[in-house]
Amino acid sequence: MKLTCALIVAMLLLTACQLITTDDFRGRQQYRTARSRTKMQNYKIFRLTKRCDAPNAPCEKFDNDCCDACMLREKQQPICAV
């Protein structure tokens, strides 16, 4: 009997907490998945339009921002390939 009463009180408390928090966030969570999907698409577009170094710009072997590839040259600094 005590366990049943404790469960009922706990359920009422949790229900009250949910109702209180939904009143606080009314209008803020609307279309949450659509907004996150739009943000993800914008991020993908941003990644696809990343600026790259011009051809013949100096680069590093492992860390470069070349549009195509970093061309290694003997006894000279590597440059971005055309």
From Swiss-Prot:
UniProt keyword Secreted, yes or no: yes
Name of this chain's protein: Conotoxin MiK42
Keywords, in A-Z order: Cleavage on pair of basic residues, Disulfide bond, Knottin, Neurotoxin, Secreted, Signal, Toxin
Keyword Disulfide bond: yes
High-level lineage: Eukaryota, Metazoa, Spiralia, Lophotrochozoa, Mollusca
Any one GO molecular function term: toxin activity
Propeptide: 23-49
Signal peptide stretch: 1-22
